[in-house]
Curated annotation (Swiss-Prot):
This is Octanoyltransferase. It comes from Paraburkholderia phytofirmans (strain DSM 17436 / LMG 22146 / PsJN). The lineage of its organism: Bacteria, Pseudomonadati, Pseudomonadota, Betaproteobacteria, Burkholderiales. Transmembrane segments: none annotated. In the reaction, the free carboxyl group of octanoic acid is attached via an amide linkage to the epsilon-amino group of a specific lysine residue of lipoyl domains of lipoate-dependent enzymes. Keywords: Acyltransferase, Cytoplasm, Transferase. Pfam families: LplA-B_cat (PF21948). The keyword Nucleotide-binding does not apply. NCBIfam families: lipB (TIGR00214), PRK14342.1 (NF010922), PRK14343.1 (NF010923). GO terms for biological process: protein modification process. The gene is lipB. Its EC number is 2.3.1.181. Belongs to the LipB family. It comes from the Bacteria. PANTHER family: LIPOYLTRANSFERASE 2, MITOCHONDRIAL-RELATED, OCTANOYLTRANSFERASE. Catalyzes the transfer of endogenously produced octanoic acid from octanoyl-acyl-carrier-protein onto the lipoyl domains of lipoate-dependent enzymes. Lipoyl-ACP can also act as a substrate although octanoyl-ACP is likely to be the physiological substrate.
Length: 241
């Protein structure tokens, strides 16, 4: 376990933050929508967080090595994208949060943003009596050692990758809730051979996607804006924090 980065307590923000529930959506549709949103935003465009669940897809970061896809005949499409990081898998039962933020307006450095996203994951896991931890040099969140996690200590439960364009972020973070984990065996997750990937259900959490998505949205809002605003149950449409 590495030391927890120290991040200043976020102050209540006056910057509007909109939470959008996009439902189950093909990855390519979300990817193109993120790029379009970022290209077209102005200095006055409110920041947004999108909550999404994707059909099965592998995504490979802009500097990613295709050799980390170990089974090219898996039947799962591979999409090359412009985020940082290597290869990961998205699929049903995973909460994906895309963060479309104006970092200059929020006076956020990229490292601080990553720290706050990671803390939101840790806080979300804690709400379900799970302990998560960071690993130095390996963005994302991993299962902390404990009496109830057995051999899953050190397994990755959340992956993170961002793109910064003109001072604005897109892409984001994925949290494994209740998934078919077998596709992760077809890759070196995030470029690490033999890295175990786990979900909350495997660790004994019975909560479903909607419940975890709502909790995660609350924790993201609290870590970004400094106020634990209540977030309504995810549903089609717009939720404003």
């Amino acid at each position: 376990m590495c030391a927890t980065p120290v991040s200043p307590t976020p102050l209540p923000s006056t910057t509007p933050l909109t939470l959008r529930w996009r439902g189950s959506e093909p990855y390519e549709a979300s990817f193109e929508a993120m790029r379009t949103f970022t290209d077209e935003r102005t200095a006055d465009t409110p920041d947004e967080i999108w909550l999404v669940e994707h059909p099965p897809v592998f995504t490979l970061g802009q500097a990613g090595n295709p050799a980390h896809l170990l089974a090219a005949d898996s039947g799962i499409p591979l999409v090359k994208v412009d985020r940082g990081g290597q290869i990961t898998y998205h699929g049903p039962g995973q909460v994906v949060a895309y963060l479309l933020l104006d970092l200059r307006r929020r006076k956020l450095m990229v490292r601080e943003l990553v720290t706050r996203i990671e803390q939101a994951v840790i806080d979300t896991l804690a709400a379900y009596n799970l302990a998560g931890e960071r690993k130095a040099g390996a963005p994302g969140i991993y299962v902390a050692p404990g009496p109830d996690v057995g051999l899953h200590a050190g397994a990755k439960i959340a992956a993170l990758g961002l793109k910064i364009r003109n001072g604005c972020s897109y892409h984001g973070v994925s949290l494994n809730v209740n998934m078919d984990l077998r596709p992760f065996l077809a890759i070196n997750p995030c470029g690490y051979a033999g890295l175990e990937t786990v979900d909350m259900a495997t660790l004994g959490v019975a909560a479903g996607w909607d419940d975890v998505a709502r909790t995660f949205a609350e924790r993201l809002t609290a870590n970004l804006d400094g106020s634990p605003a209540a977030v309504a149950q995810p549903q089609a449409g717009v939720l404003t924090a």
